[in-house]
A protein has these predicted regions:
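Short, Lys/Arg-enriched N-terminal segments with co-localized hydrophobic residues
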Residues: 1-8
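Membrane-embedded alpha-helical segments of integral membrane proteins
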Residues: 13-60
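Short helix-capping/hinge motifs at transmembrane helix termini and TM-loop junctions
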Residues: 34, 195, 255-256
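Perimembrane helix-loop junctions in membrane proteins
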Residues: 58-61, 92-99, 256
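Membrane-interface helix-boundary motifs at transmembrane edges
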Residues: 59-71
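Internal/C-terminal transmembrane anchor helices
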Residues: 68-91
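A structural signal for short, hydrophobic/glycine-enriched beta-strand patches
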Residues: 87-242
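A transmembrane-helix-recognition feature enriched in membrane-embedded lipid enzymes
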Residues: 238-257
């Protein structure tokens, strides 16, 4: 792979150091936009890989055998990484459709950021999905789950409660859980309020890219939830978040939390 890549760049007249500079510049530009930091990080990562590639080429001039071994190891690791990312991405994509048609008597709405007292775009998308589900299933009780973080004047739970009641959902159908600071806490604390007897039938509302990881966490807690997706409005953000979620899934599987 490395040799072919080197030959291709020479054939096309590409200067690898110019490529590195371009990816770094692209990363800096993308990083200026809120919500796209992970995509910016990918650009810097590609630049780093190209730089490492060039170092291996330079090493080959003085230590050809060592360079060959390192090139082979690099190619293998890169190939396995791409394969693992592709498989994980496919699993995330498959889980993103959820099961909106299935009825659940209890619903958990996972929190997201609040700007002061106003729901962020991601949180608003989740709330709109929850609202649609509650409208279609008038007997369903929901828990809005999320504590108060930095830059938030009220808890995520309070923000969600205000949003749903303003849209006409009966306040008696909404339970506020305002202590959770992570998805695992969202699920655990919400189930404590709902009752664990609903573990096999509870619905969970979250962004479509987050459903796969949320389901992994739920199953670890002994739940078998109905996953309900909230569609990310902008395609560019959706791609960014799906890519970020691949890394988040592996982080969770390796380190937990």
């Amino acid at each position: 792979m490395i040799n072919k890549g080197e030959m291709y760049m020479k054939k096309k007249g590409m200067n690898p150091w110019v490529c590195i500079g371009c990816f770094c510049l692209l990363g800096l530009l993308i990083g200026l936009f809120p919500g796209y930091r992970f995509s910016a990080g990918i650009c810097f990562g590609i630049a780093a890989l190209i730089g490492l590639f060039q170092l291996l080429i330079l090493l080959g001039k003085t230590h050809p055998k060592l360079s060959k071994i390192l090139k082979t190891a690099f190619s293998l690791c890169l190939s396995l990484g791409i394969l693992a990312a592709a498989i994980t991405g496919a699993a995330i994509m498959s889980a993103s459709y959820g099961r909106t048609e299935q009825e659940s008597g209890r619903l958990i709405v996972l929190g997201a950021g609040v700007n002061g007292t106003v729901p962020s775009l991601s949180l608003r998308e989740r709330l709109d999905a929850a609202y649609a589900y509650l409208q279609d299933h008038p007997n369903t009780i929901c828990v809005v789950s999320g504590g108060q973080g930095s830059g938030e004047d009220i808890s995520e739970a309070e923000c969600m409660y205000r949003y749903l009641t303003a849209k006409g959902i009966d306040p008696q159908r909404i339970i506020r859980e305002d202590q959770a600071t992570s998805t695992q806490e969202n699920l655990t604390y919400s189930m404590d309020l709902i009752g664990w007897e609903y573990a096999s039938s509870v619905g969970i509302v979250s962004s479509e890219y987050h459903l796969f990881r949320a389901r992994l966490m739920a199953r670890e807690l002994g739940m078998d939830p109905i996953m309900i997706p909230a569609e990310t409005t902008y395609l560019s953000l959706r791609v960014n978040y799906f890519l970020r979620e691949i890394a988040a899934v592996w982080y969770y599987m390796i380190l937990g939390g």
